[in-house]
């Protein structure tokens, strides 16, 4: 997870997807990298909302938790949803990013 998160944080790529059996370990690992907002996802609605409201740049999936078809639907939704740009959502992100300092 760390190499993917570092690639996103450095600007080498825009977004990253990380997987392990539960998704928990990779999400914790990715979130240790400054500039990363990783969400562990197991449903389509959360995939959409985490992009709209939190501008997540890494998503984690548990391969032993979600089946292949659902995982693909979650990834498609997450990749296809843009950040809302709403001021209240940006303030929330700014507060989260300030915790890294």
PLM feature segments, named:
Residues 4, 26-29, 75:
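Buried hydrophobic packing segments
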């Amino acid at each position: 997870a760390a190499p993917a998160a570092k690639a996103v944080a450095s600007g080498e790529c825009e977004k990253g997807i990380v997987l392990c059996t539960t998704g928990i370990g990779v999400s914790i690992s990715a979130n240790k990298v400054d500039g990363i907002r990783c969400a562990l996802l197991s449903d389509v609605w959360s995939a959409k909302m985490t992009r709209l409201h939190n501008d997540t740049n890494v998503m984690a999936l548990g391969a032993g938790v979600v089946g292949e078809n659902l995982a693909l639907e979650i990834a498609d939704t997450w990749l296809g949803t843009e950040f809302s740009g709403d001021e209240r959502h940006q303030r929330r992100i700014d507060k989260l990013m300030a915790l890294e300092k």
